[in-house]
Amino acid sequence: MKNLLCLLILCFCFSAFRAQQTEVHSVKYEELEKKIQEEGDKLLVVNFWATTCAPCVKELPDFMEVNNKFKDNPKFKMILVSLDRLVDQERVIKFIKNKNLTAEVILLDDIKRMNTWIPKFEKNWDGNIPVTIFYKNGEKVHFNDGEMSKEDLEKTINNHLK
């Protein structure tokens, strides 16, 4: 009986943990910008992606492998910013669960103003994805337009964690 009770408690805890991993908060540009600034002296890797973007989906397993390698470093954080529509939030949640995304995922619900906020992230960004931006102390230190290899991602992280 004790074993059964322990098993049930373990299953409940695992289910609760998995539910926490699949929450997606929607934000506007200003909230995302504030979040970037609040990360302080961490190296913040911000990847813009969508579930409908084939190159984005292709690079995510490498991003998760690298995130898992660095996630215990208190000077590192990765955020995946989904550009899917708010009405597709459930699809994003299912995608996170199916792909076992371990980084924090945020849904940027500000598509109508994208011509305003895209140049605030990078003046040369034309809006295509995937895009990965690296920040340290709230300042942009690297911009990568397009798919990023695992090797380039790790190299960029290591260069800026020094």
Regions found by a protein language model. Name each.
Residues 1-25, 162:
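Bacterial Sec-dependent N-terminal signal peptides
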Residues 23-43:
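A short beta-strand-turn-helix
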Residues 39-44, 74-77, 101-104:
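Loop/turn elements at helix/coil->beta-strand transitions in domains of secreted/extracellular proteins
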Residues 42-44, 49-52, 85, 128:
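Short pre-active-site segment immediately N-terminal to redox-active cysteine/selenocysteine motifs
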Residues 48-62:
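Conserved redox-active cysteine motifs that mediate thiol-disulfide chemistry
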Residues 61-99, 113-118:
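Structural microenvironment flanking redox-active thiols in thiol-disulfide oxidoreductases
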Residues 96-129:
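Short, internal strand/loop/helix patches
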Residues 129-162:
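Thiol-/selenol-based redox modules, centered on thioredoxin-like
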